[in-house]
Amino acid sequence: MAEKMNVESFNLDHTKVKAPFVRLAGTKVGVHGDEIYKYDVRFKQPNKEHMEMPALHSLEHLMAELARNHTDKLVDISPMGCQTGFYVSFINHSDYDDALEIIATTLTDVLVATEVPACNEVQCGWAASHSLEGAKALAEEFLAKRSEWKNVFGE
């Protein structure tokens, strides 16, 4: 990583982090003063493990729908292409500990979900690729290690 790249995560040494963790990956201030806070919510150790797509896809649907029951500050929940985590973005919400609480509460909701929201061909671009049980297992595993979420580099 000799030169700084435009994408923040490309400047992160993925060999140094220790999943699971939640880190503030960046902030942006809009022309009217609104602030976006983007969090790297890392479920799996980069280059060692990944989430299987049906479970990841269902967890994305569940988190996107359920998190909005706990905050009106959520902008988006986006899966990482590497399948190791998600980006979670908030607007005008700088409280890291509260962001962690929203994530935890949302994942707790996932554990008791009875269906994946919008899991049909009308509302989803790949409705055949879902696993409610897989999503629940990912949520349970991540929640079990909540004490590690603030420790990005395993120190």
From Swiss-Prot:
GO biological process, any: quorum sensing
Any one annotated GO CC term: cytosol
InterPro entries: LuxS_sf, Metalloenz_LuxS/M16, S-ribosylhomocysteinase
Residues involved in Fe cation binding: 57, 61, 124
E.C. number(s) listed in UniProt: 4.4.1.21
Transmembrane segments: none
Family in the record: Belongs to the LuxS family.
Cross-referenced PANTHER family: S-RIBOSYLHOMOCYSTEINE LYASE
Record-linked NCBIfam families: PRK02260.1-4
Record's subunit section: Homodimer.
Protein name: S-ribosylhomocysteine lyase
